[in-house]
Amino acid sequence: MASKRSRLLFDILSHYDLYGTEIDIMKELKKEKVWLVQNKKTKERYVLKRLSEDKTNFPILLHSKLYQERFHVPKIFQTKTDQYYIHRKGHYYYLMDYIVPSGMKPSFQQRIEGLARFHAHSLFADWIAPRPSSFLEPKDVLSAHRQKAAQLEEQAKAIDHGDALSHIMKQMAWIANQSYAWLEKSNLADFCRTAKERKAICHGDYNSNNLLLAKNREIMMIDFDRAYYGLPLDDFRFLLVSLMKNPKNDAVKRTRLLFALYFSICSLYTPYKSVYAADAMFPHVFYSETVGREKQKQVLHSPSSLDLLTRLAEQETKKFAFLSDFFKSEG
């Protein structure tokens, strides 16, 4: 006898003209959230996804709009009544194409290109419901930046013992404050206003798992569960941190490529390079590492911690020097 869950899923699929005798629910790709479905006759595969009601239907409607605009996302199907989802028991269910993966991860260059294209293509004339009640103001951005800089300052003061770690912490706190000063000088207010006028959307979770390299070599973006109206700078920062997490990576090379590629594709934000550069100056990776270790009550002075923080600090210092010159050249 079929379980309640199976009966519910088959009922959902029937709204897409897919019936129990014709389909197999092959496996659960993500526990109680994502299922792989196959048509027995055609062998076509689909992904059925469940989205919690508290996330609203925004991610689904965004996906549908991107598909309509021919952006590289999996095809999303409509029900027999031309809806993009079924609402059941506090959840939204929607059906999309299954993308056959190549088995390879997208390169960091492809990830940059993917984000830039998303920011350039996710600008729609009308708001996607639910419309946001507010949009980030310059004071909000500066306040968050100032708070993080203050945390680094506090950490530096707390371990001021005149040793190598003390020197590193002071250096990172100084860079954080310089980043804040540059951000204050930038055209941040105009950037925030423009993003609101353009109804800018952030992916919200742009990690390497949410950009697929398909078997046919196409790059496909997936999973808009955390997407929201906001500053594209948030996604840019997230990607910058992701590209620099490994201290072995060349910080300057990757930062240079990020700025060059992103703005060559998403040129509409070119007037605000100074905002992006000022934010990117902040030692984001170093900050995440030290704050994370502090929360877990890990000792920063241990040999392994000191070695990692030293390498991250070197990386952050090189990135800061490059961006300082970049900021001045942009002017």
Regions found by a protein language model. Give the residues of each.
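Active-site activation/catalytic loop segments of kinase-like enzymes and analogous catalytic loops
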Residues: 233-268, 282-307
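Helical subdomain adjoining the active site within ATP-dependent kinase catalytic cores
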Residues: 293-331
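ATP-binding glycine-rich phosphate-binding loop
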Residues: 13-40
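A glycine-centered beta->alpha junction motif in the catalytic cores
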Residues: 91-105, 149-155, 239, 283-302
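Active-site acidic catalytic loop and adjacent metal/ATP-binding pocket
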Residues: 34-39, 183-234
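ATP-binding pocket architecture of kinase catalytic cores
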Residues: 42-130
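ATP-dependent phospho-/nucleotidyl transfer catalytic cores
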Residues: 53, 129-201, 257, 307-311
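Central hydrophobic cores of alpha-helical transmembrane segments
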Residues: 275-282
